[in-house]
Amino acid sequence: APIYPLNPEGGAGLTLKELCRKKVFWLFMLMMLGAGAAENTVSQWASAFAEEGLGVTKTVGDLAGPMAFAALMGTARLIYGKWGHKLHLEKCMLGSSLLCVAAYLAIALVPNPFLSLVGCAVCGFSVGILWPGTFSKGSAAIPKGGTVMFALFALAGDLGCSAGPTLAGMVTRVCDGNMRRGILAGIVFPLLLVLCLVFGKKRRAAAGNAQADTNRSHG
C-alpha cells in the first residue's frame, strides 16, 4: 500500500536522511522512547503488583491495577482531546512527567500496598498526555517530517513499550523478586522525559536569543 504524504499544502517532505540530520528529531525520538517505557513499565506489572501487595486473586488484581491505570490514562487523553487547544502543551507535559516520577516513587517506596496502587492509577493519568503530546510537538517543530517521521516516532514508542517492562523484570529478578525495585529502576524513563523537555526549552530559548541578536545587528 502506498504511503501518503502528510505535509502542509502538499509540499515535499523531508527525506529520511534529511530527517536524521536534525538534532531535534532525535530529541523527540528519545521522548517517544521515554513515553512508551514510562507507560508500559507500570501498566504491564500493575496486576502482578496488586496480587503480590494485596494478596488478591488475579481477577481482582487486574481490576485494581491495570483497569485503574487505563481508566485514568483515558481520562487524561480525553481532557487533552477536548481542551488541549486551551492548554500550554509543554508545561502540561513537564508537569505530567514530574507527576509520573512522583508516582513511580510512591509505587516503589511507600510501604502501604493500597497507597502504592493509588500510585499506579496516578501514573496512568500522568502518562496519558506524553505520547500524543510528543507527536504534537514533533509535528510543530518539524512540519515537513511527514509520514516517515511519525512512523519512526511510533517505532521509538514501541521500543520503549518493550524496554521499560523488560528493565523492570530484569531488576526484579536480580533483586530476588522484589517488584518495587524493578519499578524503581523504571523511573529512569520519566526522568528522561523531564530532561528532554528541559533541554528542548533551553535550546529554543538559546535559538530565540541568537535570532534576536541577529535582528539587532541588522537593524
Can you describe what each PLM-predicted range is?
Residues M170-F189:
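A membrane-interface helix-boundary motif in multi-pass transporters
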Residues A76-H88, T172:
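Helix-to-loop junctions at the C-terminal end of transmembrane segments
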Residues A185-G219:
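Multi-pass alpha-helical transporter architecture, strongest
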Residues I129-I142:
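Intracellular juxtamembrane helix-capping segments at the cytosolic ends
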Residues K91-A106:
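Structural signature of the two symmetry-related core transmembrane helices
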Residues K22-M67, A71-G74:
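Extracytoplasmic gate region of multi-pass secondary transporters
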Residues P2-F28:
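Juxtamembrane intracellular "pre-TM" segments in multi-pass secondary transporters
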Residues P143-C175:
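A late C-terminal transmembrane helix in Major Facilitator Superfamily
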